[in-house]
């Protein structure tokens, strides 16, 4: 009888309540682990996007600053005044003449356009020069090269304009409409504010760089300090 009672009262395994508690605890643990995994994945993704955008903004800024700094007026046969170094000045586009190293045996000017296209890419377009007697140059109508400096520039109106232009007195020129040749000749600095982000709709990892680039050749020509 005693042996039967011992067997009767010797319960092994988990009770229903213990099983339910274990399942709840396991579920909570799995939720916590999933949350940590998602958070870590998002953090790594944001860090990667931030690094990519930083490199792209830096490279794009360096390329633009190099071209703008080399801007030079383009002498023409007539009229006596040379064409302005910057022939187009807008908030999201500019066209200039510059002497930059193109790997040529003789240094010749190049026509460069920096502009944001319909896909919000920052694109550099170049045209080669055609030499003429008297040290004069015109420019080919066929594009020499095109390259993308930044894949996704922040939407227009979301911050400062990509380009703003100032004269030797530091006065910013309005570019709501096309500038006159006199105004274009007065430009001696270009402030570039470049914001690069992962997509036009995602600004969480956006990177903004700003740089005021002087044009020493133009400043010397207009007699600025």
Residue ranges of predicted features:
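Residues that act as N-cap/strand-start positions at coil-to-secondary-structure junctions
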Residues: 80, 106-110, 207
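Short, surface-exposed loop/turn segments at secondary-structure junctions
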Residues: 47, 79-80
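A generic fold-level signal
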Residues: 11, 88-89, 187
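Type IV pilin-like appendage domain
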Residues: 88-174
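Short N-terminal edge-element motif at the start of the domain
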Residues: 71-73, 81-96
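Short linear sequence signals and composition-biased patches located at protein termini or domain-edge surfaces
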Residues: 3-4, 52, 146, 152-225
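Aliphatic-rich helix starts adjacent to a transmembrane/signal segment
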Residues: 2-73, 224-225
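Extracytoplasmic low-complexity repetitive segments enriched in small/polar residues
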Residues: 53, 59, 63-79, 105, ...
């Amino acid at each position: 009888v005693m042996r039967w009672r011992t067997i009767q009262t010797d319960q092994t395994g988990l009770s229903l309540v213990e099983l339910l508690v274990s399942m709840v605890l396991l579920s909570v643990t799995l939720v916590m682990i999933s949350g940590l995994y998602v958070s870590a994945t998002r953090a790594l993704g944001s860090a990667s996007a931030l690094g990519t955008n930083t490199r792209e903004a830096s490279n794009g800024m360096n390329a633009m600053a190099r071209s703008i700094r080399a801007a030079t007026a383009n002498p023409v046969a007539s009229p006596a005044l040379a064409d302005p170094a910057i022939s187009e000045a807008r908030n999201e586009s500019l066209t200039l003449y510059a002497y930059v190293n193109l790997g040529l045996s003789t240094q010749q000017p190049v026509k460069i356009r920096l502009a944001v296209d319909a896909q919000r890419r920052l694109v550099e377009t170049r045209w080669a020069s055609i030499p003429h007697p008297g040290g004069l140059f015109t420019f080919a109508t066929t594009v020499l090269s095109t390259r993308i400096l930044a894949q996704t520039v922040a939407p227009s109106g979301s911050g400062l304009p990509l380009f703003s232009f100032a004269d030797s007195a530091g006065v910013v020129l309005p570019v709501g409409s096309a500038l006159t040749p006199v105004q274009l000749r007065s430009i001696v600095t270009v402030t570039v504010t470049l914001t690069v982000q992962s997509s036009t709709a995602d600004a969480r990892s956006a990177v903004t760089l700003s740089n005021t680039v002087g044009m020493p050749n133009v400043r010397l020509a207009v007699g600025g300090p």
